[in-house]
């Protein structure tokens, strides 16, 4: 049923009264508008929505359908990666002279491209109208008049995580385009004379995705992220009086509470006790800090693109370093020096108690450093209006410039930043400040040697005092034609702006490479604690199917031995998450013998003490399937003195990693070895003798690929085994 509204406009004070669907405003200069289409999203739970004027229903596509409290009744949440509503409407319903669109939006993330809230356009037909958002949260109106493409963009950005009422009027008849935000006109532009172009017959429409089509690599980048409600299309012109009347139909919007109850119950690869965002892409962790009973960790985040583009700062919190909850993103690119992305950085509690961060901003041409501050324990951050405090890299480096890490020592803030010199190798540059505002460049703190395999660029540097006067200096070499990205470190002293290493050649952090870019902090008990990223290294298609990419490690505790080697153990807080204990007991293991353990699981901790006996190899099997033959084999090889992570038979999918990785490690045949294994969906973490650590990822396809076993080759051994299920 067409909703008919007759408005009489006043040039002075508005005194309104209502009679059914008629509003009178001082009865001056009548204007007629009609409601043509409406989506109110008040359906209770099914996977479709109804357009109320025609009664037609349309499916909601995407990974899951999440309804939430809206402006009036329910609203619909769009994940920014997969959710959209598509259909067609009869073109005869749509006017070609004047049209007004009203909708309520609460964006969670801004897009990489131009995301549509409502699109009635077609990439090929050169017709229609689209109302959406760009990467800065500005309202974008795209439309065709007499087949010619036109675009109007607001100078004002709408806020994230808060309801905003958007009204857009397009009138070739009066040659105007008007954009209202919360009933206030924020943009008024010209439109060419002519007629709004519509296709003949039916007009395709999309809610939550731009029908014009926009991609970056393998991913579409025009999905809307956040909540939408009360989408209405009117004939007639949008004026301040019309905006006031439409807005007056609604009360004051409440706080936004997104329904992020994404159903991962059918995803065997999703972890339950490793830190991971609700969905989307994640990268390096940093800024791990403890404040007033809560741990905060920040990370590279993108909810609307599974890769590097328009990164922002994600935020996780935890009471104990194990059970993490995602909070709202705290830093977002804005026009200017950080418009192309907020890259990594560090968090620090300033000497006056202010929670602060320092971060890398990029504008598309160069990187600089800026700061931001919090007045609510890191729930929000306010950028420093003087940013960038360091606008560009020093002249003596000629590669990238990013990833600041800061400490306070001897009355100064000391900051190192990753960089490099192409002809020499990776390095970190060094700055100091008395007030966290004015920074003095002090030169290159430490220069690597590209000829020694140390890479040409270093990222994610760490300078951490692990014991009295003894520092860890850790960097990550970026991948090159000699080796992948890998973390290595020196230990030594840091005095008077100089780091003096205890040994010449760096040590690798991992036995088998797979754990990168650790965030390092002191926990509430004074222990050095680290959490890093464990990439999935699967295809973009597989990531798109999952709806997320990468995750973070369980917390580790680091100590140093006398030789300056970092000893790595799982954090003791993990013990609190142990569930059922399964005592396997003592096992005698013979070469070729299988089914030594009667246990199946995807989320558990296994502690095994091996008496390695005469075996040439000893290890364990995960993700074992009787139906497909899939299995993930992890073992120590005495003949090569290596730990081996063999994923060659771990999956029947061609979209995931199925490689074999090795890492040198010295063990004596016949010795006793304690191995602590954490399995959580697709991720593996192994701790050896409470000293060393390595990781892996595996993605079996079969439903029964959850078998666990121990094995030996070339001799015999024994093991004492206890398994705990892990609950979270």
For each feature predicted by the language model, list its residue ranges.
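Extracellular/lumenal carbohydrate-interaction signature centered on repeated Trp-anchored short motifs
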Residues: 30-35, 89-101, 123, 155-164, ...
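Glycan-recognition/cleft segments
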Residues: 116-142, 195-197, 621-648
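Extracytoplasmic low-complexity segments
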Residues: 21-82, 123, 187, 201, ...
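Beta-rich accessory regions
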Residues: 259-261, 494-505, 509-513, 522-532, ...
